Amino acid sequence: MMKFMTEDFLLSTSTAQKLYHDYAEEQPIFDYHCHLNPKEIAENRQFNDLAEIWLEGDHYKWRAMRSAGVEEHLITGSADKYSKYLAFANTVPKCIGNPIYHWTHLELRRPFGITDTIFSPETAEKIWHKGKELLQQPEFSARGIMKKMNVNLVGTTDDPIDSLEYHKAIAEDNTFDVEVVPSFRPDRAFKIELPLFNDYIEQLGKVADIEINTFDKLKQALSKRIEHFDKYGCKSADHGMEIVRFSPIPDEKTLDQILQKRLNNQPIEEEEIAQFSTALLVWLGTEYHKHHWVMQLHIGAIRNNNTRMFKLLGADAGFDSIGDRAFAESLSRLLDSMDQTDQLPKTILYCLNPRDNEMLGTMIGNFQTGGIAGKIQFGSGWWFNDQKDGMERQLQQLSQLGLLSQFVGMLTDSRSFLSYTRHEYFRRILCEMIGGWVERGEAPNDLNLLGKMVKDICYDNAKRYFK
């Protein structure tokens, strides 16, 4: 019987252990997509206790607590922090089999060094006091944790109207050498169907100092914001796409009419929504290509399913799930529309429904280009798939349908400074898979060859890709 979470956690063969400890473990973290608050990095937030650093904004943990029957006031409500922490401590033993159980114990080990204790209601008080003591120390501030976890870069997720004042402050601070760059997230600009679209266009116009009343003026405003983001080191643009729409792009006059209808609060048809979003996304893609940015498409979530809780808590509170809309043909035509003019940017495709893994695994091969290794990527297991089984599926299907050796690897996609252990989780799973190939005679026992592949996937490929 193996002990719980030893140094060889998830590594069942000697080859896997060598690959992880000799090649993967010490690689820096290039976290190219996350939802950290740049203000907390700029101000080097010092968290007071484990409730703050663990439970604020972490909808993974919130969902688990709700599933365990915890009352909402102990999750997102008015209860004191220690009571919320104890409610989580009571939930964790019920999470065996869920990735939260592994993540929680990995987060205790790194960065806190708590390796000899299983988190439970019985150990909660001891761990609370230990965590509180450590969190008062400078090396456990937001920046301190990033340094302890060997983070090289983080890419935050930012709206085009953001001033990027905190990114500017971080870049000008010579005492901090972790690169913190913005990522351009224009969802509210291309989703013309959103209820608050008109309000957003007004805000965008003010920030860009342009009155947006035509499609060309909208492009001008977004172009100015792209230049603003580029100035502060932006390397990527991210897009959340519940639905992948495609329609042949109409002439500018038709696009102006669609925009005017929407700005005048007139109803627009589904075909008009598709025409508008296609036109704007294709144009945005060519802009990203011009600036050498990476385009990321996160596809397939159903968001804000619970109307009552959405009204109470707003978005991103743990009430989203996996969608099942088909999108292969529309995605292919969208990418092809950019590629026809040789202006398709480097692109990472993520699906929330694992049913679509093989489809994306083959889709990326349609648009690869000489001179850019792995130009089009099948992204790491996202959201409900960034757990052991989901990561294994994505890695296996990418290796079978594409080139695993060119993969840009893991990202946290998280709002928590403790989520860097997800890179460790991924690296262990990667090394276990490759080590298993060697043990079964499916790959050569060449640690130089495989070790370089592991290092590339863990760090070097992403470092080269996002430049």
Swiss-Prot record:
Signal peptide start-end: none
Stretches that traverse the bilayer: none
Keyword Coiled coil: no
Keywords for the protein's UniProt record, in alphabetical order: Isomerase
Pathways involved: Carbohydrate metabolism; pentose and glucuronate interconversion
Gene Ontology MF term list: glucuronate isomerase activity
Catalytic activity from the UniProt record: D-glucuronate = D-fructuronate; aldehydo-D-galacturonate = keto-D-tagaturonate
Any Pfam family matching the protein: UxaC
EC supergroup of this enzyme: isomerase
Biological process, per Gene Ontology: D-galacturonate catabolic process; D-glucuronate catabolic process
Keyword hit for Lipid metabolism: no
Entry EC number(s): 5.3.1.12
Family, similarity comment: Belongs to the metallo-dependent hydrolases superfamily. Uronate isomerase family.
HAMAP family reported in the protein's UniProt record: UxaC (MF_00675)
Protein name per Swiss-Prot or TrEMBL: Uronate isomerase
Organism: Histophilus somni (strain 2336)
